[in-house]
Every structure is written in C-alpha cells, then in structure tokens.
Amino acid sequence: MNSEIINVYNVCKHIADNKHSTEVNDLLVEELSELIKAVIKLERYNFCDNTLRCNYHDIYNNIYEELADVIIMICQFIHKNKISHQNLLDEISKKIIRYYETISDK
C-alpha cells in the first residue's frame, strides 16, 4: 500500500478515535446521502434537465468532494466498528469475480 494512503488511513483512524461510534455511523449515512444527491444531479445533467442551475464542471467538483467525504467516513466506519480488513477484502474479491463472470457471459 502506498505510504501516503496509509498515512491518510491512520489520520482517519485517529479522527474516529475521538468520536463515538454512533456519530461515525450517522456521519457516514449523511455523507452517503449527499453523494447520492450529487450522482442524481449528474444523471439529470446527462439527460439534459433544463431545470438544473449548474454546469458540468460544478457537478463534477461536487462529486469529487462528496466521494472524498464518503471515503473518509468509510475509513472511520471500518476502524470504529472493527471491520476485519481481510474479511472485507475477501468479500470485495468475491463480488468482483461474480460481477466479472456476469459480464464475461454476455
């Protein structure tokens, strides 16, 4: 793992250590909902919704910001809730293989 990524994860762990688990969980839900709103706005833009009062650049900047917030909160959630890294990686691997097999069959 890249040392910069490890440092970011360690900072996220330190931040999480100073929060109650309920706060971390609630903030993750909040950040996920903000990302969902940003993705919906992108979809509306892609389908030429004339009621949008923003441009493509603004939408993508918002998506980057919300993705960053979600990733930070996921790191804190993993740490605070003692999610096993190995179990998580195993589950990710299984899902990727299953998704890959699905598209390979087409």
Locate predicted features.
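Flexible "arm" and connector segments at domain edges
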Residues: 1-67, 71-106
